[in-house]
Regions:
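N-terminal glycine-rich, Lys/His-bearing helix-loop that initiates the first secondary-structure elements
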Residues: 1-95
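PLP-dependent aspartate aminotransferase-fold enzymes
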Residues: 84-154
Length: 154
């Protein structure tokens, strides 16, 4: 075991599993055991592991600009292209896109946007958010509070 803290995991009840590599829809542990990875790496590998088109696109972007934040009105061509592509996909006129790091980040931002909206329209008392029980919405504080899974609350 390493010095890592594992999210939503009780290692006394769950044996540690070391995943070493992935190919297509399969991942392999450090003993060579193959597993069908049915959750797309928690939703981040829906195009499969080792997809050469994705690998090359990521490598090219890393060579061009490995990272740049979007705070303070900064942007970059890849972010603008992605935002425009996503906005063109939705049936909303003049759509806007928020690019975040995760679904948890997106849900936290939605909570903030809702609070901002209702304050802006003079309805600050509207602060309750309805969420589904036994549904996963993320592990950040706001997203976990929306999640109906009690282990995610601690």
């Amino acid at each position: 075991m390493t010095q890592m803290i594992y999210p939503t995991t009780n290692l006394k009840a769950t044996e540690q599993l070391v995943i070493e590599r992935g190919e297509g829809v399969y991942v392999y542990d450090n003993r060579g055991q193959q597993y069908l990875e049915g959750m797309s790496g928690l939703w981040c590998t829906s195009l499969g592991y080792g997809n050469e088109e994705v690998v090359e696109a990521a490598a090219q972007q890393m060579r061009t600009l490995s990272y740049s934040h979007l705070f303070g009105g900064k942007t970059h061509p890849a972010a603008m292209k992605l935002a425009d592509t996503l906005a063109d996909m939705v049936p909303v006129n003049n759509a806007r896109v928020f690019l975040g790091n995760s679904g948890s980040d997106a849900n936290d931002t939605l909570v903030k946007l809702l609070r901002y909206h209702f304050n802006a329209v003079g309805r600050p008392e509207k602060f309750k958010i309805i969420a589904r029980e036994r549904a996963y919405h993320g592990v950040t504080v706001a997203a976990a509070s929306l999640t109906g899974l009690v282990p995610n609350h601690t």
